[in-house]
Protein backbone atom coordinates (compact mmCIF):
# COMPACT_ATOMS: atom_id res chain seq x y z
CA UNK A 1 0.00 0.00 0.00
CA UNK A 2 1.18 3.52 -0.68
CA UNK A 3 -0.86 5.88 1.46
CA UNK A 4 -0.39 7.07 5.04
CA UNK A 5 -1.59 4.89 7.88
CA UNK A 6 -5.21 5.33 8.90
CA UNK A 7 -6.77 4.50 12.25
CA UNK A 8 -5.49 0.99 12.83
CA UNK A 9 -8.54 -0.51 14.48
CA UNK A 10 -11.28 1.06 12.35
CA UNK A 11 -11.87 -2.15 10.41
CA UNK A 12 -12.26 -4.12 13.65
CA UNK A 13 -14.86 -1.77 15.09
CA UNK A 14 -18.49 -2.82 14.80
CA UNK A 15 -20.74 -1.62 12.00
CA UNK A 16 -23.81 -3.44 13.36
CA UNK A 17 -24.38 -5.40 16.58
CA UNK A 18 -26.97 -7.58 18.31
CA UNK A 19 -27.75 -9.57 15.18
CA UNK A 20 -28.89 -13.14 14.72
CA UNK A 21 -27.84 -15.30 11.77
CA UNK A 22 -30.78 -14.10 9.67
CA UNK A 23 -29.85 -10.49 10.37
CA UNK A 24 -26.28 -11.02 9.19
CA UNK A 25 -27.41 -12.69 5.98
CA UNK A 26 -29.91 -9.89 5.37
CA UNK A 27 -27.19 -7.22 5.53
CA UNK A 28 -24.26 -8.93 3.77
CA UNK A 29 -24.19 -10.23 0.20
CA UNK A 30 -23.13 -13.73 1.13
CA UNK A 31 -24.18 -15.18 -2.23
CA UNK A 32 -21.92 -12.68 -3.99
CA UNK A 33 -19.08 -13.52 -1.60
CA UNK A 34 -19.24 -17.24 -2.25
CA UNK A 35 -19.57 -16.61 -6.00
CA UNK A 36 -16.36 -14.53 -5.95
CA UNK A 37 -14.63 -17.36 -4.08
CA UNK A 38 -16.01 -19.82 -6.65
CA UNK A 39 -17.51 -21.93 -3.90
CA UNK A 40 -21.07 -23.16 -3.41
CA UNK A 41 -23.20 -21.33 -0.87
CA UNK A 42 -23.54 -23.49 2.28
CA UNK A 43 -26.97 -24.91 2.91
CA UNK A 44 -27.37 -23.42 6.39
CA UNK A 45 -27.04 -19.92 7.82
CA UNK A 46 -24.91 -21.32 10.63
CA UNK A 47 -22.29 -22.52 8.13
CA UNK A 48 -22.36 -19.19 6.30
CA UNK A 49 -21.86 -17.27 9.54
CA UNK A 50 -19.04 -19.60 10.58
CA UNK A 51 -17.23 -18.77 7.33
CA UNK A 52 -17.76 -15.03 7.92
CA UNK A 53 -16.43 -15.32 11.48
CA UNK A 54 -13.37 -17.11 10.14
CA UNK A 55 -12.53 -14.06 7.98
CA UNK A 56 -13.33 -11.61 10.81
CA UNK A 57 -16.14 -10.08 8.79
CA UNK A 58 -18.39 -11.07 11.70
CA UNK A 59 -17.61 -11.64 15.39
CA UNK A 60 -19.54 -13.34 18.17
CA UNK A 61 -20.48 -11.08 21.08
CA UNK A 62 -22.46 -11.77 24.30
CA UNK A 63 -25.45 -9.87 22.88
CA UNK A 64 -25.33 -11.64 19.51
CA UNK A 65 -23.44 -11.41 16.25
CA UNK A 66 -21.65 -8.23 15.16
CA UNK A 67 -20.62 -7.22 11.64
CA UNK A 68 -17.23 -5.50 11.63
CA UNK A 69 -16.45 -2.45 9.53
CA UNK A 70 -14.23 -4.78 7.48
CA UNK A 71 -17.19 -7.05 6.76
CA UNK A 72 -19.42 -4.12 5.88
CA UNK A 73 -16.87 -2.45 3.59
CA UNK A 74 -16.21 -5.67 1.68
CA UNK A 75 -19.61 -7.40 1.60
CA UNK A 76 -22.44 -4.96 2.38
CA UNK A 77 -25.54 -5.25 0.26
CA UNK A 78 -25.92 -1.52 0.97
CA UNK A 79 -23.16 0.48 2.66
CA UNK A 80 -25.86 3.00 3.56
CA UNK A 81 -27.25 0.43 6.03
CA UNK A 82 -24.19 1.04 8.22
CA UNK A 83 -23.58 4.49 9.70
CA UNK A 84 -19.87 3.83 10.24
CA UNK A 85 -19.09 3.11 6.57
CA UNK A 86 -21.89 4.84 4.65
CA UNK A 87 -19.57 7.73 3.71
CA UNK A 88 -17.01 5.25 2.37
CA UNK A 89 -19.15 4.42 -0.66
CA UNK A 90 -17.54 5.42 -3.96
CA UNK A 91 -19.08 8.54 -5.52
CA UNK A 92 -19.05 8.86 -9.31
CA UNK A 93 -19.56 12.23 -11.04
CA UNK A 94 -19.64 12.64 -14.83
CA UNK A 95 -19.07 16.19 -16.07
CA UNK A 96 -20.09 17.74 -19.37
CA UNK A 97 -16.83 19.18 -20.67
CA UNK A 98 -13.42 19.55 -19.06
CA UNK A 99 -14.40 21.54 -15.94
CA UNK A 100 -16.72 21.07 -12.96
CA UNK A 101 -19.16 23.68 -14.32
CA UNK A 102 -21.81 21.23 -15.54
CA UNK A 103 -22.68 17.73 -14.29
CA UNK A 104 -24.43 15.55 -16.85
CA UNK A 105 -28.08 14.85 -15.98
CA UNK A 106 -28.38 11.97 -13.53
CA UNK A 107 -24.63 11.40 -13.54
CA UNK A 108 -23.79 12.04 -9.88
CA UNK A 109 -24.34 8.83 -7.96
CA UNK A 110 -23.02 6.63 -5.19
CA UNK A 111 -22.02 2.96 -5.51
CA UNK A 112 -23.76 1.58 -2.44
CA UNK A 113 -22.59 -2.05 -2.61
CA UNK A 114 -19.64 -3.36 -0.61
CA UNK A 115 -16.29 -3.03 -2.35
CA UNK A 116 -15.83 -6.67 -3.31
CA UNK A 117 -19.37 -7.62 -4.27
CA UNK A 118 -19.96 -4.41 -6.25
CA UNK A 119 -16.54 -3.91 -7.82
CA UNK A 120 -16.97 -5.47 -11.27
CA UNK A 121 -20.28 -3.65 -11.85
CA UNK A 122 -18.76 -0.37 -10.64
CA UNK A 123 -15.78 -0.61 -13.01
CA UNK A 124 -18.13 -1.45 -15.89
CA UNK A 125 -20.33 1.55 -15.08
CA UNK A 126 -17.39 3.96 -14.88
CA UNK A 127 -15.88 2.61 -18.11
CA UNK A 128 -19.24 3.00 -19.87
CA UNK A 129 -19.26 6.71 -18.93
CA UNK A 130 -15.90 7.40 -20.60
CA UNK A 131 -15.72 8.78 -24.14
CA UNK A 132 -15.93 6.17 -26.89
CA UNK A 133 -15.68 5.93 -30.65
CA UNK A 134 -17.08 3.43 -33.11
CA UNK A 135 -15.33 1.95 -36.10
CA UNK A 136 -15.99 -0.84 -38.57
CA UNK A 137 -13.57 -3.77 -38.49
CA UNK A 138 -14.07 -6.87 -40.63
CA UNK A 139 -17.63 -5.69 -41.34
CA UNK A 140 -18.38 -5.49 -37.60
CA UNK A 141 -19.03 -2.32 -35.66
CA UNK A 142 -16.71 -2.07 -32.65
CA UNK A 143 -16.73 0.44 -29.82
CA UNK A 144 -13.40 1.63 -28.46
CA UNK A 145 -13.27 3.56 -25.19
CA UNK A 146 -10.73 6.27 -24.45
CA UNK A 147 -9.21 4.36 -21.53
CA UNK A 148 -8.40 0.68 -21.01
CA UNK A 149 -10.80 -0.83 -18.50
CA UNK A 150 -7.94 -2.68 -16.81
CA UNK A 151 -6.17 0.60 -16.00
CA UNK A 152 -9.34 2.06 -14.47
CA UNK A 153 -9.80 -1.16 -12.51
CA UNK A 154 -6.30 -1.06 -11.04
CA UNK A 155 -6.41 2.63 -10.13
CA UNK A 156 -9.81 2.25 -8.47
CA UNK A 157 -8.72 -0.90 -6.62
CA UNK A 158 -5.63 0.90 -5.35
CA UNK A 159 -7.73 3.86 -4.22
CA UNK A 160 -10.08 1.64 -2.21
CA UNK A 161 -7.24 -0.23 -0.53
CA UNK A 162 -5.09 2.81 0.24
CA UNK A 163 -7.70 5.33 1.36
CA UNK A 164 -7.27 6.87 4.80
CA UNK A 165 -10.13 5.30 6.74
CA UNK A 166 -9.64 7.77 9.59
CA UNK A 167 -11.02 10.50 7.29
CA UNK A 168 -14.54 9.70 8.44
CA UNK A 169 -16.54 12.11 6.30
CA UNK A 170 -15.31 11.13 2.87
CA UNK A 171 -14.47 8.27 0.57
CA UNK A 172 -13.14 7.68 -2.92
CA UNK A 173 -14.53 9.95 -5.65
CA UNK A 174 -14.33 9.21 -9.39
CA UNK A 175 -14.68 12.24 -11.68
CA UNK A 176 -15.11 11.66 -15.41
CA UNK A 177 -14.40 14.60 -17.73
CA UNK A 178 -14.31 14.75 -21.52
CA UNK A 179 -10.50 14.70 -21.53
CA UNK A 180 -9.55 12.80 -18.35
CA UNK A 181 -10.63 10.67 -15.40
CA UNK A 182 -9.64 11.72 -11.88
CA UNK A 183 -9.80 9.27 -8.97
CA UNK A 184 -9.61 11.14 -5.68
CA UNK A 185 -8.53 9.30 -2.58
CA UNK A 186 -8.72 10.51 1.05
CA UNK A 187 -5.23 10.39 2.53
CA UNK A 188 -1.68 11.35 1.59
CA UNK A 189 1.07 8.98 0.45
CA UNK A 190 3.87 7.82 2.70
CA UNK A 191 6.06 7.13 -0.32
CA UNK A 192 7.27 9.76 -2.79
CA UNK A 193 5.11 9.69 -5.92
CA UNK A 194 8.02 8.57 -8.11
CA UNK A 195 8.38 5.39 -6.04
CA UNK A 196 4.76 4.17 -6.34
CA UNK A 197 5.67 1.61 -8.99
CA UNK A 198 8.88 0.23 -7.51
CA UNK A 199 8.12 0.06 -3.80
CA UNK A 200 5.33 -0.93 -1.48
CA UNK A 201 4.42 0.30 1.99
CA UNK A 202 1.69 -1.47 3.89
CA UNK A 203 -1.56 0.20 4.88
CA UNK A 204 -5.08 -1.13 5.55
CA UNK A 205 -3.39 -4.49 5.02
CA UNK A 206 -6.32 -6.66 6.12
CA UNK A 207 -8.69 -4.79 3.84
CA UNK A 208 -6.13 -5.17 1.06
CA UNK A 209 -5.78 -8.90 1.73
CA UNK A 210 -9.55 -9.41 1.72
CA UNK A 211 -9.92 -7.57 -1.58
CA UNK A 212 -6.92 -9.29 -3.17
CA UNK A 213 -8.32 -12.71 -2.30
CA UNK A 214 -11.55 -11.74 -4.06
CA UNK A 215 -9.79 -10.36 -7.15
CA UNK A 216 -10.54 -6.68 -6.57
CA UNK A 217 -6.93 -5.49 -6.60
CA UNK A 218 -3.67 -6.86 -7.91
CA UNK A 219 -1.02 -8.63 -5.89
CA UNK A 220 0.97 -6.41 -3.57
CA UNK A 221 3.09 -3.82 -5.37
CA UNK A 222 1.93 -4.68 -8.90
CA UNK A 223 -1.16 -2.48 -9.28
CA UNK A 224 0.39 0.76 -10.51
CA UNK A 225 2.94 -1.21 -12.51
CA UNK A 226 0.00 -2.76 -14.39
CA UNK A 227 -1.53 0.69 -14.95
CA UNK A 228 1.65 1.85 -16.70
CA UNK A 229 1.61 -1.23 -18.93
CA UNK A 230 -2.03 -0.74 -19.93
CA UNK A 231 -1.80 2.98 -20.67
CA UNK A 232 1.41 2.57 -22.67
CA UNK A 233 -0.25 -0.16 -24.75
CA UNK A 234 -3.07 2.32 -25.53
CA UNK A 235 -0.60 5.15 -26.27
CA UNK A 236 -2.02 7.32 -23.50
CA UNK A 237 -0.03 9.99 -21.65
CA UNK A 238 1.55 8.83 -18.35
CA UNK A 239 -0.80 8.97 -15.39
CA UNK A 240 -0.34 11.91 -13.04
CA UNK A 241 -0.52 12.02 -9.26
CA UNK A 242 -1.49 15.25 -7.49
CA UNK A 243 -1.28 15.77 -3.74
CA UNK A 244 -3.80 17.98 -1.95
CA UNK A 245 -3.89 18.94 1.71
CA UNK A 246 -5.60 15.70 2.77
CA UNK A 247 -6.17 13.75 -0.41
CA UNK A 248 -4.40 12.21 -3.39
CA UNK A 249 -5.64 12.38 -6.99
CA UNK A 250 -4.60 10.04 -9.79
CA UNK A 251 -5.32 11.44 -13.26
CA UNK A 252 -5.72 9.33 -16.40
CA UNK A 253 -5.67 11.49 -19.56
CA UNK A 254 -6.96 10.84 -23.08
CA UNK A 255 -4.79 10.16 -26.08
CA UNK A 256 -3.43 13.33 -27.63
CA UNK A 257 -2.36 13.28 -31.27
CA UNK A 258 1.11 14.72 -31.85
Give residue ranges: language-model regions.
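Active-site helix-to-loop segments that bind/position phosphate- or nucleotide-bearing substrates
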Residues: 1-153, 159-167, 176, 189-200, ...
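Short, charged/polar, Gly/Pro-enriched secondary-structure boundary elements
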Residues: 82, 256-258
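Glycine-rich phosphate-binding loop
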Residues: 150, 201-235
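Short beta-strand/loop element within the Bergerat-fold HATPase_c
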Residues: 171-179
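Short Gly/Ser/Thr- and Asp/Glu-enriched loop/turn motifs at secondary-structure junctions
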Residues: 178, 243-247
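Glycine-rich/acidic phosphate-handling loop/turn and adjacent ATP-lid/helix
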Residues: 181-215, 258
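Glycine-rich ATP-binding loops of the HATPase_c
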Residues: 235-242
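Short C-terminal beta-strand
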Residues: 246-255
